[in-house]
Design a protein with these regions (language model features):
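PP2C/PPM-type serine/threonine phosphatase catalytic domain
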Residues: 1-115
């Protein structure tokens, strides 16, 4: 499988709050991993939220020894969200920050997606 990823801030916004991760090789026990996050426009630290959420999800998936893709992804999302919420509460400059998140992995002829 070959993959390609690109992101662009567009012509209106100065800052691109999008972030992505794309790996067509194994990440932990998943054979591949694709993630897109879009920091909430207009909210504080949206760029930080999208980047760090993806970095935490990738780290969690990499360390997870499980073999059930849904559980691996769900656990990674929950851990990343807990950290993001805590940071938002502890640091006023990040108060209210957030991001959307879409994760996919292809195993055999099945696509697993979390949104």
């Amino acid at each position: 499988m070959k993959t390609f990823s690109i992101t662009d801030a567009g012509i209106i916004r100065e800052m691109n709050q999008d972030y992505y991760f794309s790996s067509d090789t194994a990440v932990g026990n998943l054979p591949n991993l694709f993630i897109v996050a879009d920091g909430m426009g207009g909210h504080k630290a949206g760029d930080y939220a999208s980047r760090h959420t993806i970095e935490r999800v990738v780290a969690s998936v990499s360390r997870n020894g499980g073999d059930e893709p849904v559980s691996i992804i769900k656990e990674a999302i929950n851990k990343a969200n807990e950290i993001l919420v805590a940071e938002s509460r502890e640091d006023e400059t990040k108060s209210g920050m957030g991001t959307t998140l879409v994760i996919g992995t292809i195993i055999g002829n099945k696509l697993f997606v979390a949104n």
